């Protein structure tokens, strides 16, 4: 059996009782290409912004040494009461076989959570024998085995028709926003099959990468795709967690960065999700997301605005949000310095937690 992604490094990487940041030294990351793009505020024109790459240039990213006073830090929390978790079962200290032996318990409400072969399940309803909580269609679609299997086998590639420049270019663009928090931890929220989780892990720009999704089948695909890649670098820094985006199992102010690739339009409540992201981000932490927005006439024709609301209510999709609404959500949730890049329906946005 191949080594599980959720491996023995749980005891040194996530540590429900004590999260120890890696001792990082200054390194240079030489990117193979430089992404040139224009970042504008939402108050600027909504015209499309072109995204170019220059394969002849390099971008240097320097990871600064972390403050010694931040050497130990809690991160995992109970999704019910948001208090810290403690080990119940931690087989042999370092878990080298499967996550199924992991069991943690909330120090306050005493609710326990466990892991399976592929991931640690920290959803509120995890372990329920009879209760099943249905989600909106846009969420349930990605919980199906078929869509989870197809996501990196043709599904995601079709996003190019919506203006998405492709995972590699999107990763390069995101790094520019994430530069202030390099060397810290990052949550790849709604990670799907782990496309960006693997890119973040392989880059070695972060001390810990948490691949988080609500779909069990997506996390299984993430696990399988990772373990198919022989000698995948920095595997010990990647952890798979199942959780609800609107109920993140992390302590307040414990996370350096949150990335959400092509996900925001599928969240049942974008405002609830961004509020949670704002809660877990530390001061100065960065939120970066990409999504589709088909604003156009839906943003200014009254009849179509009402139709938009009905479509979103029944489908659970939020593709008809506009730029100003996305900025409003971020501001309402306590995030500042909203910027964005557009290319047709594609938008990459970034906002930060005030320092």
UniProtKB/Swiss-Prot annotation:
Gene3D superfamilies noted in UniProt: Vaccinia Virus protein VP39 (3.40.50.150)
GO cellular component, one term: chloroplast
Transit peptide: 1-49
UniProt keyword Transferase present: yes
InterPro entries, per the entry: Methyltransf_11 (IPR013216), SAM-dependent_MTases_sf (IPR029063)
EC number: 2.1.1.-
PANTHER family the UniProt entry points to: METHYLTRANSFERASE, OS08G0411200 PROTEIN
Family indicated by similarity: Belongs to the methyltransferase superfamily.
Full protein name: Uncharacterized methyltransferase At1g78140, chloroplastic
